[in-house]
Amino acid sequence: MIAHIINLMRCNVHVAIVTAAGYPGEAQKFERRLEGLLETFRRLKLPPDVTDRFHIMGGECNYLLRVTPVSKRLEFVPDAEWQTPDMKSWREEDIQAMLTDAQSLLVECSKRLNISVQFMRKERSVGIVPISPTIYEVLEDIALTVQNQLVARVPFCGFNGGNDVFVDCGNKSLGLQAMMAFTGALPHETLHVGDRFTLSGNDTATRDVCSVLWVANPDETGFFIKMLLKDIRKSRWQPYIE
């Protein structure tokens, strides 16, 4: 997969990982998730004009990171450089009120379904992680309940992560829109690849923004990237004409 990502970047394609994971002010935690990729950037001594095409959008749409030109580490892009006007209009008190209400719903659902959970609250998200194994449908029930009952003044995303349920400020659709504006990509030039397109998944909202590809595992992602690279190479010697 690392080779596929680098080959895309060398073909002038921007590659961004849009993830629910959010670590405000802690770029090193994002780096730990991508140690192999960043180390390969360093080992191959990739020039900045290549690594500038790699980004991470964390917390659905709350944190944008880029690769530093020399050390090939991750750094946060200042909010003023990439946030959309709508994002800049969100008030902190409204965000915290949404998270508090979401936490109350998560508590209520956990008690109703009689499951023991650990709560996690961050700057822009709140969630539960079951302490003991539970069935998928229980998490599905909680995610759908939050989606339908939570009312807030800011956009939010309540989703079943498979082993947990989280509510984030914003959603991946907003993250993609901000990412596209930042890189200058148009909707017809953008493809979002994900595996959580069900009603309780956090990829679903992206269908309103660009083309999507629903995959089941990383192997499928790799297969389609190889197809894309093959088409890109073909187009260089055989231009597409309608």
Q: Where are these predicted regions, by residue range?
A:
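Active-site phosphate-binding/coordination module
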Residues: 3-115
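A generic structural motif
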Residues: 10-14, 154-156, 188, 209-210
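Short, glycine/serine-rich, charged loops/turns that create anion-binding
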Residues: 22, 61, 130-133, 197
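Short beta-strand/turn micro-motifs composed of small residues
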Residues: 19, 58, 130, 194, ...
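Short, charged/polar "capping" segments at the starts of alpha-helices
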Residues: 24-27, 136, 221-223
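A short acidic, often aromatic-flanked loop/helix-cap motif at beta-alpha or helix-coil junctions
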Residues: 56, 62-66, 126, 163-167, ...
